[in-house]
Amino acid sequence: MALSRRTFSALAGSAALGLALGGSGGPGASSAFAARTVPTGPAPAPPSADGEPHTIGYDRYSLLVDGKRLVVWSGELPPFRLPSPSLWRDVLQKMRAHGYNAVSIYVAWNYHSPAPGRYDFTGVRDLDLFLRTAAETGLYVILRPGPYINAEVDGGGFPGWLTATRGRARSDDPEYLAHVDEWLTQVNRIARKHLFTQGTGTVLLYQIENEYDARVGSAGSRAYMSHLYRKVRADGIDVPLFHNDKGRNGYWTPGSFDTGSERGGWLYGFDGYPSPESTPPDWGTFGPGGAKGGASASPSTPGFVPEFGGGWFDPWGGVFFDGLGYAESRRTRDAAYERRFYLTNLANGLTLHNVYMTFGGTSWGWLPAPVVYTSYDYGAAIDEARQVTDKIAPMHQLGHLLQRVPDFAKLDRAADVRATGLKVYHLTNPDTGAHVYVARNDGDDTVTADLPTAAGDLRISVPARDAKLVAADLSLGPRKLKYASVQPSMRVTAGRQDIAVFTGPKGEMAELLVDCPDEPDVLRLDPEAAWVLDDTGLHVNAPLGQGGLIRVLVEKGERDRPLLLLLADDATAVRLFPYDTPSGTVLVYGPALLRHAEVRGSEVHLSGDIAETTSMEVWGPRGIDTLVWNGRRLPVRVTLSGSLMTTGPLPGVPEVRLPRLGGWRMRRENPEAGPGYDDSGWRTADRKTSFSTTAVPEGQPVLFADDYGFHYGDVWYRGTFDDARGIEEVALGYSTGTQGLLMAWLDGEPLGTHRMPVPDRDTVRKGTWTDTAAFPVREELRSPGRHVLSVLVRRMQHDQDGKADDGHKAARGLTAAVFTGASPKVVWRIRGEGPPDPVRGPLNNGGLHGEREGWHLPGFADRDWEPVDFPVSARYQGVTWYRTTFRLAVPGDVDASVGLTLEDDPYRAYRAQIFLNGWNLGQYINNVGPQHTFVLPNGILRTRGENTLALAVLSEFTTLSGPGTVRLSLLGRALGGTEVSVVPSPGR
């Protein structure tokens, strides 16, 4: 299969397409490239918008880019969860530096569409900018625009307005498809400008739908998938398409639905999220085979896992991680987890590998689905505050290995070998003869065993519940590695020498055997290493982590090109960064991050980050003698290994001082609860029918908020009736997401509050919660005359539609009102959020009075508000607003990540919406948790200027309410960073 723009220039389904693509569309069929053997060779150069056309092909081993094998080592990054476009570059550069060659992104329909026919791809929603930035960074893009994405976002990514439409979602319903086509037209108009096939961008693959496992065998579901396929092709998208199978079902393999006469443009992919306690599964080469065996469902396409767990989400209350939050997700799915599971995947031939998530970000505003709270940190390798964690080490080592050592792109199963106490996978490259062994320890104790290799037994140690990759007969340039007890991490050529890097845990004794037919000169450049030469070759031993990087230089002998061996423990290895320049490869050791490298004559210019005092060492093309770091020329010396090394340490990061938050002012709201409030401008809730999946109770009008155009945040109801005599109780039925809440007033007097329960393990995935709040009516309120029942509902977002049953259409808000003791005739009026903020978008605000009046915005005149000191202790039913300003003065060359931390007595029942410079950055529920610290993204946060902070505190009245302690927290700092543009934050 070879795809190019010209191949797909005609409408998908033409006879010409079928001829051009050959026949890889069904089981057993082969791609166009399969007619000839594609030998092992160097990987393609890092991608860019180079203006040159490219082909994308595949065989059963891997993708083929311009005829060269490509192992896709990708990480998920949702741009909509990082609402500061300057920071996209920061995270993308961190991914590239740490071994990723691709980024996978969902595009959320609800994020871009506030109403039918209205789409916004500007500002924080600038998809074009993200795709340009990815190309400039040198990363392929896997684009996933749905239309359904799931992703733990409101409605699974469906826009709120879709809940009030007739068509059944995720089906071939014509009304639904009309909306879908409109959405895809908008996305594809941007995507087709960034296709790798055209040389105008780096979009490599494109997903349609997601985890679509409902009614798979029906004609309607096949027609739906066929419609999406044809639509995307008709819009000019000519890269391979795929779907992400929920689990290993064998759904939507090539040939399972009609693609017209086109063949070869479809890949099979599946996802997996194994628990840390489970045994890593074999979903490919070593698996059971068949339709439900993972990659074996599509034997003619390469093994593809569009989502493999890089962490896990956490619900309100934190039941998944015992209330400890995402730190516990990161601890239980740590670097050892990654090695056990990801190495098993690679052994099974999964050469298209995307880790979900690599950076999770923040579900800001009303973006989160009911099953998650604000933070979507996920326990990922890069945390929500953009800090690289210990989990990056395996990703860094394996990513650079797969890009820099081509043998790993084409592996066949080899003869079984055994090592006591270990599960061993043995593979070999049919072209080079290299042998690869993945040794996995599923036990609770370290295992030391002899591993049979082609060069003899090799003693290896694998820590408990960990894994190790070792290689034998592996080319290191002109020389060959016979075996090594530690993992190869990369191989580069810098100037006239080859450099091979090997890594392992701190304290492990590394043993290498290098084939040396003629006696070489060996120079031990660091005292930790030892070597001996005998008839079998050069033996090198070194304890990893004893003094940092260990260098051994091998030169002369039969081979005239020197070989530099670099041995590193995990913490050291993540500070080794290769970078390809037009003048040759540069290898940098020392900084926390290398963002960019460029050779200008004899000067090598580097930019990046420093997290602590460090030295720096650079290997590069011949003739370089000057090192420039972040624009500053550094004094260097030339070492015996041929590198440039700084003569003194680079300074660490300056101190970052954060101010104490004070000067608070407060004002209470809820005028809507008062009997004299003017609601004449509100919508009358008088509809009789609804497209919701929730039945309208008999005798009741439709009270569902979505039916009246209110889709996000809080919604108010006012029910007017005459004569309250005899009323003993009012029962209010309502439907919300997780932790939904209702509070009611009669003639301005509080009746009480009702809240949905905290989810447990049995209900954690429940997306719609229904209940009835019954409030007794006090005797003094049972009077004749006009009365107003006021109700505030916090809806807590729409359910996702994972079962393709229109679950996102379940009602939100009130569903019914029933009186005991009398039956007054009630006229209901409803009001929710106002028009969408033109900058912050439709998900930023709900229907609180303060939101409509701009109390959350910078510049609002709050001088007449009451001064207040924290902590606060008050009992009140309803919303109280608190505002303050603060000024930061972070040094200009420092990238500081800042959070807002709220803490209080966990018994107190209240929640707070956090607005920074008008941006709704999350919701804190004091008595539920587990989240206490909220990331304030730079760009929205003015790190060198004034900021406005507003808290909208919703108090339940059942207990005293805060806020308690509210403070700024430093979440990370580095000297360097990227240039951050201010995110527009219009105010009053």
Residue ranges of model-derived segments:
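Substrate-binding cleft/loops of secretory-pathway carbohydrate-active enzymes
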Residues: 223, 246-287, 364-367
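Aromatic-lined substrate-binding rim segments of carbohydrate-active enzymes
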Residues: 88-98, 104-153
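N-terminal carbohydrate-binding accessory modules
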Residues: 35-101
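Aromatic- and acidic-residue-enriched segments that line the glycan-binding/catalytic groove
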Residues: 117-123, 149-170, 260, 371-373
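Non-catalytic C-terminal accessory domains or segments of carbohydrate-active enzymes
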Residues: 392-941, 948, 954-988
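N-terminal export signals
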Residues: 7-28
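Catalytic-core region of carbohydrate-active enzymes that cleave or remodel glycosidic bonds
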Residues: 277-367
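Active-site neighborhood of glycoside hydrolase catalytic domains
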Residues: 179-248
